Amino acid sequence: MLWNARSLNNKLHHLTTELLDGELDAAFITETWFKTQLNNCTATLKENGFSISHFHRDNKGGGGVAVIYRHNFKLHSSKSYSFDTFECIFASISGNTSQKINFIVVYRFCELSPAAFLLEFRQFIESTFIHKKNLVILGDFNLHVNKVSEPDIIQFNEILSTFGLSQLIDQPTHVSGNTLDLLITNKNETEIKDIVIDDINFSDHSYIFFKISCELQKSKDKVISIKTYKNIDMDKFKNDIVSKVNIFSGKNHVNFGDALNDYNALCENAVKDYVFAKSINVTESRPKWMDSEYTQVRTHRRKLYKRWVRTRNEEDRIAFVSAREKTHLLSIEKQSKFYRDTICNAKNSQKALFSICNHLLDMSKSKVLPSHTSPIVLANKFNDYFIEKIEKIRQGFRVLTRPLMDGLDTYLGPVMTEFALVSPECLKKIVLSKPIKSSPEDPLPGFLFKNCLDQLLPALTELVNLSLSTGSMEGLKDSIITPILKKVDSDSELLKNYRPVCNTLYLSKTIERTVLVQANDHMDRTKAHTPNQSGYKPFHSCETLLLKVTNDIFTNLDNSKCTIAVLLDLSAAFDTVDHDELLSILWSQLGFRGTVFQWFENFLGGRKQAVIIDGHKSEFRNNRYGVPQGSVIGPFLFNIYVRDLMRLMEEEGFDAHGYADDHQFLLKFQIDFQATAVRLTIPSTLDLIGKWMNRYFLKLNPSKTQVIIFHPDSKHSDISFGQLILSNGSRVQISNQVYNLGVTLDSNMSFSPHISASISQGYGLIRNITGIRKYISREHLKTLVNSIIIAKFDNCNSLYVGISAYEAGRLRKFQNACARLIYGRNKREHVSDILRELHWLPCEARTYFKIVSYVFKCLHNLAPIYLSELIVIKQLQDFTLYVPRTLTSYGDRAFSCIGPRLWNSLPIDIRLINSLDCFKSKLKHYFFNSFTEYKAELNKYKTS
């Protein structure tokens, strides 16, 4: 079927009904008007047994093309193209024979002239025709082909004739009486028959039904093996675990590998008597909300449609339209009742709510894989690709590693030679400190492990202590990797668009957490932590790092100084770490010796990995580099590995900051007389960084490395750095805005690009949730909006202090739109009353709330050192802070200035609170009731 939907969002029910009742195999849609890759439309299609591949416009509304096809058909490739005059999507569907049909769905923009389109279309067809056979070109061409004497139509027909193509539609397809929707093919290659044009639908374009003589290749039903845990007698199971643990403990293990084998056997033997595996066929089924009443109404609707097609009687048409509307309303009623009952039956749990939301918005984590005939072959391809990718990067380095214990004589601090053994109570705290997420390779699923933790604790304690005392992790070093598509709109056929994700065994995570606690304690005692490295550290986050960076930028701008920032981009940084270099740092710089060093050496060495697809594992391959995927201690080790880079940049006069593999370096300068020196310094510094990274087997990507200069508005015309050229000929462009840890920073610190992007994304979420709000109660809708939209809206909003009134107004309007979404109000209705009912703070108050919360954390040792040192207590008795003097509004926006000002304006009873939760509660209540009076107090504390 071909159809110009003119917004599929509000016509999807009718399209789905047409697909199901007409037993259609595929639909080709133009003007979908989709705004995002995933929404409730794509979710509804998938729920009804169809897949969709579509192209949407990012920069403006309207347009969009899509191919919809049954789940069990194999769409071999799908690519979208956008030209100046039209957009299209290409899809290739194979038959059971070698025949392959290549569909191209086209939508021409009517804003541009037909002559421009014909020129582009000829070039497109010429390039496509050479490489593809069995072409079917269809879509809305916005050409009146029924007016055969017009010059544009004559030229269009000549183009088709040149390539042996025929246009098959000879009836009007638009309410205006013109033929706009076309079906084009080579009759000698592809036979199209039984073309029917149906004008009863909800668009100004007709349905075009047709048949193609081709037996499509269908996927076989998937057979999966599942285990059922529902009927376990937990008391009996726990008693069985206790008896097996007693046998385990009586063996007095001295070898970690033997103990691990016995533990796995213990768990497997305990489970096998209670859990049974069975194989089931995964077949298509109708949505769960479809009951017999709805099925009868839909069947009646179909009968009325067939009667009207047969008679073309006006009374039959009216009866069909009435039945169609009744079916539509009943489907909404049934879905609403089903989803609301599901949430209520789950005792209003947020987990059930978000599961339904993900399902309705097509946000569920479904596996997308390249087309394949054998999962094992594909798994081996992925494993080879992931290994060889790192091997190729490593081969680009021509460096001889230094001896393993190089630097031994230079370390004079305390050493750590052995781990302290843990008690069962201590281990239980470590286990419960994080959510229990098990791997499919674990001998016990997560919920059983949690329920039986007390019974398993003696065996777990023995295993953990054996690992710590012997320095062994043997048996826990095989990684099982799942390939995950990096971006939803990436080409799923290319292996480079996938990232390896490993879900580590839970026992390994537990041992690593125990090691991490003691290793961090040692580094705290020896003051070995890098203060400005914020990744994977308590009280540190992207927002704390950005607060520090923007504080320094604002302070420099306040003193009429510019700041140049270099944001590095590394290729596969975690995966190219050299084990010998890392072990050398652990030994010579941090003082890890004896059994502790042996544990790290054993943990890193002898690792293997395999890829799993649909339960089929590839062959294991040796993994000689990198910190282990999915490990708890891997990020900690990476921070250690790059610690010298931070020191190197500080020695060069830069302020260095890092978050995992994202590193940035800032340098302040006077534009009047230091600009030339800085322009020469940055390339040499990047060369120095490149040499250091080459030395440590890290690959710097100059083309993606970002450089930006933050400058006062008055100095904008004085800056003309242009491109920076490195010694190897690489060029680094100086940008006006950069993407830094999730926030777009612009050169004059207006945050306008970031706010625009955030609001655009937010309105997309509002649009999606609007499509499903009819299925969810208001209370549940509040939870969704707060968790999905407002949480993202508040992300890094502490940086918004001092933004322009225009930007503040945009944020306020967006917040109002969120409130209207919950209460179903239109855009012209006031929202003051519902904002109070929702207990939402105004946008400015939300920013102040976040900043004051960080000040509280700084004063109570709950923040990074680099933030805490910006806050100075002035008077201890009333807990007031020193407010530094500033010269411009830039200085007023710095955290070191605005933080104390906001703090000093609070009532003393709030400032003296010691509990963070209590402080936030009192602060929100105060802001909610007295924010206007609070703002009036701010002017009293401009400077100290």
Give each language-model segment a name.
Residues 143-154, 572-590, 664-690, 802:
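Catalytic palm subdomain of template-directed nucleic-acid polymerases
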Residues 1-132, 145-150, 154-165, 176, ...:
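Short phosphate/oxyanion-binding micro-motifs
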Residues 124-138, 515-533, 558, 563, ...:
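Active-site palm subdomain of RNA-directed nucleic acid polymerases
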